[in-house]
């Protein structure tokens, strides 16, 4: 069983987040009561990971945990085997006492594209929607954020996050909750909200943008990253079935169309700050994620297209302000 008591105590002391306590404990109790086939196995492995008190933690330039006195080889091998129990590792990379967790995604590259364009995170409270295993939350703390709350319904992502947090010494500035955005009340409590890699999974993208706006304080900043296509403000791709072998994908606007959508739901100061074609060096199969990845999803004869014939993945970052 997971104990979220620390988070409840934290938000009880925050006047903006206190109202969340009206619904959150029951939601997390319901989540605990739902069965997941592998969760018990993962939890046993998590409980075997040692409580960390590392001598060095670098979350400014990477996510790296190390000690002045290295682990014995046997201890390292045991730790690596425990961490490999949580395969596949999709978001990272992490370096833990010399163990390099080479994840499917180079999430640090995305962070390097996003960071120059956002308001400084120092002393801000942050919500990361669809946070994966929390890699970017650690980087947000590295930029001085006061509190990072991530939401993602994946059981495995929660386990991976808690494993890294345990090895870090139990840092209570970051918390991952196994929820979807639709389960959050209108909190209007966060200074910055991130939604990266989520919008194309939503059947109603405008509703998603409104849900994000509902979590921001007045004057707060949205950082939105999603798959886009090239084109003018009227260009939108709606795949008929899969896109790059992904199910449950719906709307791929152009960056210009997405800017219009953000303005339509009431955001101001909307800027397209980055567009980038995803490379096979940024998303690929690794020793820590052995399933198919981007190289398998592109047309082998024309890598500018997916295997379904759509334009290859292109991602845009937009920033916007809530009035």
UniProtKB/Swiss-Prot annotation:
Pfam families the UniProt entry points to: Methyltransf_9 (PF08003)
Annotated binding of carboxy-S-adenosyl-L-methionine, by residue: 91, 105, 110, 130, 152-154, 181-182, 196, 200, 315
Keywords noted in UniProt: Transferase, tRNA processing
Name of encoding gene: cmoB
Recorded catalytic activity of this chain's protein: carboxy-S-adenosyl-L-methionine + 5-hydroxyuridine(34) in tRNA = 5-carboxymethoxyuridine(34) in tRNA + S-adenosyl-L-homocysteine + H(+)
Top-level taxonomic group: Bacteria
Protein EC: 2.5.1.-
Assembly with partners or alone: Homotetramer.
Keyword Transcription among UniProt keywords: no
Organism lineage: Bacteria, Pseudomonadati, Pseudomonadota, Gammaproteobacteria, Vibrionales
Matches recorded under InterPro entries: CmoB, Mo5U34_MeTrfas-like, SAM-dependent_MTases_sf
Function comment: Catalyzes carboxymethyl transfer from carboxy-S-adenosyl-L-methionine (Cx-SAM) to 5-hydroxyuridine (ho5U) to form 5-carboxymethoxyuridine (cmo5U) at position 34 in tRNAs.
Organism: Vibrio parahaemolyticus serotype O3:K6 (strain RIMD 2210633)
GO terms assigned for molecular function: methyltransferase activity; transferase activity, transferring alkyl or aryl (other than methyl) groups
Listed GO biological process terms: tRNA wobble uridine modification
Catalytic EC class: transferase
Keyword Metal-binding: no
Protein family according to the UniProt entry: Belongs to the class I-like SAM-binding methyltransferase superfamily. CmoB family.
Protein name from the UniProt record: tRNA U34 carboxymethyltransferase
